[in-house]
UniProtKB/Swiss-Prot annotation:
Record note on quaternary structure: NDH-1 is composed of 14 different subunits. Subunits NuoA, H, J, K, L, M, N constitute the membrane sector of the complex.
Annotated signal peptide: none
InterPro entries xrefs: NAD(P)H_OxRDtase_bac/plastid, NADH_UbQ/plastoQ_OxRdtase_su3, NDAH_ubi_oxred_su3_sf
GO cellular component: NADH dehydrogenase complex; plasma membrane
Family the UniProt entry places it in: Belongs to the complex I subunit 3 family.
Protein name: NADH-quinone oxidoreductase subunit A
Natural source organism: Nitrosospira multiformis (strain ATCC 25196 / NCIMB 11849 / C 71)
Gene this protein is translated from: nuoA
Gene3D superfamilies per the UniProt record, alphabetical: NADH:ubiquinone/plastoquinone oxidoreductase, chain 3
């Protein structure tokens, strides 16, 4: 038996599986088209909100800080993955691996310190000098802008 015949006998289950998956997808989509309802009404293009009547538009602005936090999460999540892989292979990597991990952590720490210093992590209102805001007698945490 030659090499191409051996390869063909080894790959036929994969080809058969692929063919069956494609046939199943086509069959389900055809069945959905045949059985499904075809009516157009005003409510057809509206999203279903569990029986609650929609009010207003769904489009509203989100602060860019939400996206910034998502980016921070991704960065430090990837850092955790790299450090976990480093910890698993710690004995094989030796001192060079340890030094590389320290450099990696230092670069990410410097980036975090830079962003913190830049104010990228401040969620509250901007801090002002004490002369511009005066304490109000109504609440200890309530400030009124003096004119």
């Amino acid at each position: 038996m030659n090499a191409s015949a051996t390869q063909a006998t080894e790959i036929w289950p994969l080809v058969a599986y692929f063919f069956l998956v494609v046939m199943l997808v086509v069959g389900v989509m055809a069945l959905s088209y045949i059985i499904g309802e075809r009516h157009r009404s005003k409510a057809t293009d509206e999203p279903f909100e569990s029986g609650i009547v929609t009010v207003g538009l769904a489009r509203f602005r989100l602060s860019a800080k939400f996206y910034l936090i998502a980016v921070f999460f991704v960065i430090f999540d990837v850092e955790a993955v790299f450090l976990f892989a480093w910890a698993v292979a710690f004995r094989e990597l030796g001192w060079p691996g340890y030094i590389e991990a320290i450099i990696f952590i230092s670069i990410l720490g410097a980036a975090l310190a830079y962003l913190w210093r830049l104010g990228a992590l401040d969620w509250g209102p901007p801090r002002h000098s004490a002369g511009r805001f005066a304490k109000d007698s109504r609440s200890p945490n309530h400030a009124v802008v003096s004119k």
